[in-house]
Structures are given as C-alpha cells and as structure tokens.
Amino acid sequence: MPVRRYGGRYNSSSPGVSNALNPSRTAGWPLSPSPATGSKPASTHHDPVPQEAYYVKDEADARHQQQAPLREPSVEVEVEIIDDEPPRGSQKPLSVAPCTANANNSSGGSKCNAITASRYTFYTNAYQKSVYEALRSLRPLPELQEPRRVKEYAETSLKDSLYRIVEAHDVIMVAGAFFGDEGKGKTVDAVARHPLCTCIARVNSGENAGHTVYDKAGRKFVFNLAPSGLLLPGKRNYIGPECVMDPVSFMEKEVIQLIDAGIDYRDRLFIGNVCIVTPYHKLLDLLGSAANSSTLKGMAPVHGSKVMKRGIRLDHIFNDDETLRKRLEKDMDTYFGLLKVKNLSDADVVRLCREENSDGVVRVPDYVIAFAQAEDKVEFLVKLYRDRVRHNPGFPARCDVTYELHAALLRGEKVLLEGPQSYWLSNARTKFWESTTSADTTAAGLLAASQLNFQKFKSVVLNVHKAPGSSRVGIGACPSSFVPQDYFSAQNIKTLRDLPSATCAHFEAVQRTLFRDGFPHSNDKARHNGIMAPVEYSDETGTYNIGVAMAIASAQHHGECGAVTKKPRVCGFFDCVLHHEVNNIQGPYLTISALDRGDEYDKVGVTIAYVYYSPEGKQVDVNGHVYKNGDIIRAGDPVPSEPALYHCHPIVKLIDGWRDNPIAAAKRRRNAPLPRGVCELLSAIEYFTNCKILSIGNGPNGDDIIYLRQ
C-alpha cells in the first residue's frame, strides 16, 4: 500500500517510503477491536481515547483483568467484571483494588470505566500483537541512518556559553519544550545568578506548576508560584497580574517555607493584581474534571471567570467588602449551577473531597472543605480573605509588576521570565488543546503576559527538554510514551508510592529487555525499522508488556512524579517530531536535562517519525489533511492534533549507550571528551530538529551542567 505523507524532504517514490506497510497484511485493513466476550460494550457520548495497542481483544485477554479504572472524561459507564485474576504468571496480585460496578445505580453509571476495564492489561494482549503484525513490515526509513556525520562536542564554561547569550539580550525566557517537568530549574538558577539579572518573574499560570529548589545550605524548598530567585540574595522576584493565585494556599504552602527558614522576603517578593483562585474554583475543578486530567488547582474554572470578567483580583480583597461580596456572589453562580445540574448537596461535595484525600495526599485543602460546608459561602470567603490575606502581616508586598519590570530594563538590568509548564501544555497550542493547561505557556505567551515591549527590548528563549525518560503527566496523546497517558490512573495509581515496590523494580533488566528484544534488528541497518515489538518482561511478580514494564521501572527508578500532584509521569523516547515545531516557533537554543541517566542504558532512543495506523481503518481530518493508514509523519512535517496522534506510533532511532564512559558529575573528569554515544545522540537531535544544544545536565546538583562550545 503506498504511503501518504504531508510535506517534508521525501515523496511517495522515495526508497524505503513507498509501500510502507505490507499489502498482504493491510489490504482492506480488516483488523478491528472487539470487546471481550460476554462483556458489556461501553457506550459514551464521544469516541473513547483510542489507545488501540492496549485494548483487550478477546476473552482470553479479559480473564486477566484486575485493574481499577477510574472515571473516563465526563461520563460514567456500566462495566461487567469478567474476572479479578492476577496478571498472567504472577505470584501475587498487584496492590490495586479491583473495579466493582454497581448494577443497581439509578443513574445507570458506575465508578468504573468500561473502556479502561476492557482495554488495559499489564501483559501483552492480542490487540497489541495485531497492531505490531500490521506495522512490523514497515520499510526502514532512510532517515534512520541520519545523521551521517557525528559532531564532536567540547565542554566550555558558563561564562563563555550561557552568559554570552544573557549579556546579548534584555529579557531571557526559560521555557519548557515538552509537557512540563523538563528540569527547567537548573537553567533558571544559572541565568538568575548573572549579576545583571536582577528581576525574576512568573507572569502567567498558577500553582499547578511546581519546582523544587535548594539553597546553599542544602535546604529544600518546593515552590509553585514563587519564583526560584527568592533564594538568591539581591534579586527581586515578581508574580505578575496575569497569574492566578490562591492567596491562602500561597501563604500556607510557599511563604511559610521562607518564614520557617528565616529568609527575609519583604523587599524581594512582590505580587501584582493577580486573579484569585477561590475554593469554589477548586471544587468546580474536582467536580467537572476527568480522572488524571487536572491538578485540582482550579485552573480552568478561574481562567473561565477571568475571561468572563466575573471573578475577583487581589485588589478587590484589599478594598471594600461590599464590592467583594457582590463579585463573589455573581461569580459563584457557576458553582451553584453545577451542583444543581449534578444534583449534589454540600454533604455530597464534602464526601467527594474526603475521598480525594483518602490516600493521605491532601489534594483538597481543609479551608476548601470548610467552604463546601459553610451555610453562607459568600460571607465565609469575605472573612477568609480578610483574616488570611488583607490583615495578614506576613502577606508579601504588592506592586505594579509590569511597571517595575519595565523600569528595571530601562536601567540596563536583565529580566528573567520563568516559564511554567511548557510549549505543548499551552492552551494556545491547538494540537493538544483538550489536555492542556489554561494559560498560554509558550514563550510567546510569557512575553505577552509580561507586557514588555518586544520591539524595544531584545528577548531570547532557552528551551529545556529531558532525556532519556522524556515524560508527560496527565491525560492526552503522546505517541512516544511507553504506555497511554491514562494508564496509571486506570490502575488506580494516584501517586508514585501506589506502585507496588517489587513490580518491575530491576530497571537494569527491564531496559536490557527493551533494547535487546523490543528492537530485535537494532544492529542490522537493513532490517531495523524503528517499530517496537510488544515483547514481555517477567520478574517474580508477573509478566508485563515491555512498554508497561518500562513505564513502571522508569517512574520508579528516575523518581518521575509530578511536583504538584505526585502522579507518576509516563516516560518515553525523546520526540524529534514534536520538538521540531518547538524549535521552529521558539528555537534554536535547547538545554537537555538529566542526560546522565543515559549512563544506565544499553541504548537510547529518539523518535524521528510517526506511522499512522488505525486497525479499524479510521481516518482523521486535521486542518484539511486526511490521515490514513500508512501515513508517515516526519520531524518537520505539520504536527497533527490529538485525534490523529492517538493513532500514531513512534519510529525510533537507536543510539548506543555510554556505560563504559559515564558522564555523571560524580564520575566524570571536568573537560573530559564526551562519549561517542552522547555526541551521536546530540547530533541526531540537532539534525532532526534544527536546534542548537547549549548544555546537558549530568547530576542532581544545581551546577551539574556541561556547557557546550558553540
């Protein structure tokens, strides 16, 4: 079957591209998923997230189900439990609760998700095998042999690399280049330490972002809205008016850390006229969000209030109570309306809040629960803000942040804009629009929110990515991930510690199985096509699909969990297809964090293209282009949106590791030549994305960075 593609360097007659899939396997595309025999099919108001490779195809597969799926986006559906037997070959069941449906539920729903109950398995199921059988005949793309020349990278100093860029610009933006959690803190800290960089600012988003920083004494601080520069003497830190803030949470969780550590923030932390995240915004988030889709920080609801001009800003709290009451009363209509539609009482809301906190992680604060219980909710909030904010002597100073940043630039000082989340989590990016945050967290969004004159002041973007173990947390498509984004939540795994400690605990063995068996022809250039085989990994706890094993092992071994939610992040390969667009929009500079992880890998992988394949033969129209089975999407082609990306499978280029020549700061001699594997990886990323790599992270400490000569 001829391959159809969209733009790029190659056409349908290029060697290794035409007839990308074996016609004997794909003619007519007969493969289609079927629910397990005897189970009730899920009925939803929209297509389920089509992660086909994890669908249980037959009754034999279904017999091994024991997961505890959570709620699917905005719907609850009935599910028949086939069996709660442990995963195949296991000695004992995993410590996740089996799903139980309430057949007598008057609403016709249950607490279980039929899609995930029938779709996800720990082991390799028949559906995964069928997908692989269709793709295994894909002809190797010529790009798998690129780049032909491996660059040599030499180490240089901070002063001769990063600081030259800082000194040539007025506004420096540090931005996430993937889906957040890229390790931006090191680069922020390095830029902030420059003598001319006097102002560090957060200019949008809210406490759904999170970063961990350490002071010189080694004390740990976890900040969400507070800029990282608070720990550096002589720096002024700002939270701009386009940010959204829960001032009670900000005082209780962030400012209290500074107070307890004896850090004087009075002349170093300033807050603009931010939009206020109220308790009802957080409850709206809880009541209206799908499992694993939100940090429960009220982001979407408060941005809704902001756009509708119905909410309150910080200045309202510091002025007359009557105006505050009227605005709160009007804005709260949305909350009361949702309770009415869902037929929920205050007691129901309190119960749901306590259920959310039942595992010991406080996702819904006490004062939010107290609000839900309050009879006069408006008066409750007026008093809450009067006592905890307006009359709180510890509340930081307020100012016109835009004016102060502009004044600093006119004095010749540098301004650092600390980007929350990332490019692909930005609400302004249509590709992942349904699973993004609610602010524009691209570099363009940062600059717009700062309200600094981009024609007057010279700006630069420092993009940050992470490899190996590029990760995403939350729902949505991510073709390069080892498992679907909702895989962990479907097992009722809310935090990293919910993962059974003995499961896939031998990271060394798991990664070896992936690269040895998952890519059986990796050493044969004529046969390696970059498609991962659905092989299995076994340990004393059971047998697991290699993608599942790598997802669990990576999350545990690398400590990959959300800084805010503690949810396990889903790891995968560095994605050149996605980063090419990031580089086009806000490149070319890139720093790669955590590259010393590669010291423990036999090989490292980078996704250089996707192949579109839907066993049902489903076609997806994106921006007027219809994606069909066999389409190849290369780095440099337009990135399709999520409806198509759910059907995309990664084509992975493998690069030999550097175990014998580790780069970790604790093991490497400064200025020692970088291993060939590192140079090959960096060369591949630069080749496929056109970026310019400034530095690589090689350890946990703030100064564990190798700067590269340009």
UniProtKB/Swiss-Prot annotation:
UniProt-recorded name of the protein = Adenylosuccinate synthetase
Gene Ontology annotations for the cellular component aspect, listed alphabetically: ciliary plasm; cytoplasm
The principal localisation class reads cytoplasm
Biased region (Basic and acidic residues) positions are 44-54
Q: Which HAMAP family match?
A: Adenylosucc_synth
Q: Entry's InterPro entries?
A: Adenylosuccin_syn_GTP-bd, Adenylosuccinate_synth_dom1, Adenylosuccinate_synth_dom2, Adenylosuccinate_synth_dom3, Adenylosuccinate_synthetase, P-loop_NTPase
One GO MF term on file is: adenylosuccinate synthase activity
Function noted in UniProt = Plays an important role in the salvage pathway for purine nucleotide biosynthesis. Catalyzes the first committed step in the biosynthesis of AMP from IMP.
Positions contributing to Mg(2+) binding: 181, 210
Subunit details? Homodimer.
Kindly list the positions annotated as binding GTP: 180-186, 210-212, 569, 697-699
Q: In which pathway does it act?
A: Purine metabolism; AMP biosynthesis via de novo pathway; AMP from IMP: step 1/2
Ranges for region Disordered: 1-54
Q: Which UniProt keywords apply?
A: Cytoplasm, GTP-binding, Ligase, Magnesium, Metal-binding, Nucleotide-binding, Purine biosynthesis
A single Pfam family, by name?
Answer: Adenylsucc_synt
Q: Does the keyword Ligase apply?
A: yes
Q: Which cofactor does it need?
A: Mg(2+)
Please give the PANTHER family that the UniProt record associates with this protein.
Answer: ADENYLOSUCCINATE SYNTHETASE (PTHR11846:SF0)
